């Protein structure tokens, strides 16, 4: 008996839009268990990737790494080293490295992925992901010119609107570090408009709100910064739930409130 992946993805989309983070995690764990019981390797890989990605967003990288270890062997056995499936998995593992602050490992993985994709055809979507993720690692290492170059390369080849929105958030974060706040705000507002227009309550929307909040904070517009941090926390709480990223958002919100109080006293 084969696992119904089409039904899984439909249910997962509903969970992301209508359920809280705990319910989504339980759903993913239950479905992953079903794929293992059915011994459906294709489904184990697909659902395992979604579960590991969700754990990564929650900051639970140790658990995510364990799942990636399981599915990496299955991917190599099923598709081989020079394959889009393996390249896609390496990109996901690199995301986990970035969350775990293993930036050099992430860059090495993504360079390897780029080499694999150069030997395959029809790889624009995956190559854009390489650029996006490597840009994040470069940004974390303060290699801002390389980070901006990668993200701009991604935007040149992406056609999917949602992926464009993600790339614009990433570009905005680089521009913030370069203190180009006006340009950063244009990029992140484009992303926010896309998510709100399409009623997509996703973790990426929380990231967009937090990025906007950071821009307003740097511009000393503390009330607006607070507004966007609160929106970011609401969306993150709905879609992911508790975790270190939410803790950081709350810390940033409190810092913005403190700075607003100080500004009122001056």
Whereabouts are the PLM-identified features?
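Short coil/turn linkers that connect adjacent helices within long alpha-helical scaffolds
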Residues: 37-40, 77-81, 119-122, 156-161, ...
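Terminal, low-structured helical/coil segments at or just beyond the last alpha-helical repeat
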Residues: 236, 241-266
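Amphipathic alpha-helical segments of tetratricopeptide repeats
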Residues: 29-34, 69-77, 111-119, 152-157, ...
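Alpha-helical segment of the N-proximal tetratricopeptide repeat
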Residues: 6-38, 50-57, 99
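Conserved alpha-helical positions within TPR/SEL1-like repeat arrays
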Residues: 13-17, 46-57, 84-99, 125-140, ...
């Amino acid at each position: 008996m084969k696992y119904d992946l089409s039904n899984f993805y439909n249910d997962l989309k509903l969970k992301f839009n209508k359920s809280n983070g705990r319910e989504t995690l339980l759903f993913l764990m239950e479905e992953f268990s079903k794929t293992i019981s059915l011994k459906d390797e294709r489904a184990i890989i697909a659902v395992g990737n979604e579960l590991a990605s969700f754990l990564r967003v929650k900051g639970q990288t140790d658990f995510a790494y364990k799942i990636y270890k399981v599915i990496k062997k299955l991917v190599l056995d099923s598709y081989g080293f020079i394959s889009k499936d393996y390249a896609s998995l390496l990109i996901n593992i690199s995301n986990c490295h970035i969350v775990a602050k293993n930036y050099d490992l992430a860059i090495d993985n993504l360079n390897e992925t780029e080499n694999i994709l150069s030997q395959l055809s029809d790889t624009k979507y995956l190559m854009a992901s390489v650029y996006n993720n490597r840009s994040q690692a470069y940004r974390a290492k303060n290699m801002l010119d390389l980070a901006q170059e990668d993200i701009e390369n991604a935007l040149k080849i992406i056609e999917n609107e949602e992926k464009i929105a993600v790339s614009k958030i990433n570009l905005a974060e680089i521009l913030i570090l370069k203190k180009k706040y006006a340009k950063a705000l244009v990029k992140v507002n484009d992303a926010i408009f896309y998510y709100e227009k399409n009623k997509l309550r996703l973790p990426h929307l929380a990231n967009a709100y937090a990025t906007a909040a950071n821009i307003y904070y740097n511009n000393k517009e503390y009330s607006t910064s607070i507004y966007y941090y609160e929106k970011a926390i609401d969306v993150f709480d709905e879609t992911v739930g508790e975790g270190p990223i939410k803790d950081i958002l709350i810390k940033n919100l409190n810092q913005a409130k403190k700075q607003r109080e100080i500004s009122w006293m001056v």
